[in-house]
Amino acid sequence: MANAIIETAKERFAQSHQSLSREYASIRAGRANASLLDRIQVDYYGAPTPLNQLASITVPEARVLLISPFDKSSIKDIERALNASDLGITPANDGSVIRLVIPALTEETRKELAKEVKKVGENAKIAIRNIRRDAMDDAKKQEKAKEITEDELKTLEKDIQKATDDAIKEIDRMTAEKEKELLSV
């Protein structure tokens, strides 16, 4: 039963890491990356639809994203959604495809994005600490219900803390890696 608490916590830690990884992938680092467009929703026949379901997104060059709509009539809707997004990139529509040229990041923009990365990383650490708190509470409930002894509780708390420390180290590593990617010219 005690192992179930740790396993559940570790699974939740892994989910937090995956979520953070997706979040970092959507922060542009001056290079074209199809995941930059993951959050873009297009108003397609009145329904918000993810862009990647309406078009293929390719990276023909280091700083260019090429969006090829499956349905050519949706090109105006896609262009409208890209203009309304917070990407800060103006789409170039040639009638059959849309090109997004990713501008080089200025030093100021890099620093702003690095701050954003730190903030996202800190939020992920808070999520990890909340998971730890839930696991510790579950362990204490088991001890109160006499399912585990006090010694087992102490061991379990140490194991939970070690798993938490490992999860936070991984977040720190991911954050440092993304900051390095952003700040390297």
From Swiss-Prot:
GO annotations of cellular component type: cytoplasm
Top-level taxon in the UniProt lineage: Bacteria
Localization per Swiss-Prot or TrEMBL: Cytoplasm
Pfam families given in the database record: RRF
Main location: cytoplasm
InterPro entries according to UniProt: Ribosome_recyc_fac, Ribosome_recyc_fac_dom, RRF_sf
Disulfide cysteine pairs (residue numbers): none
Molecular function via GO: ribosomal large subunit binding
Sorted UniProt keywords: Cytoplasm, Protein biosynthesis
GO biological-process terms attached to the record: translational termination
Function: Responsible for the release of ribosomes from messenger RNA at the termination of protein biosynthesis. May increase the efficiency of translation by recycling ribosomes from one round of translation to another.
UniProt family annotation: Belongs to the RRF family.
The protein's name in its UniProt record: Ribosome-recycling factor
Source species: Streptococcus pyogenes serotype M1
Gene giving rise to this polypeptide: frr
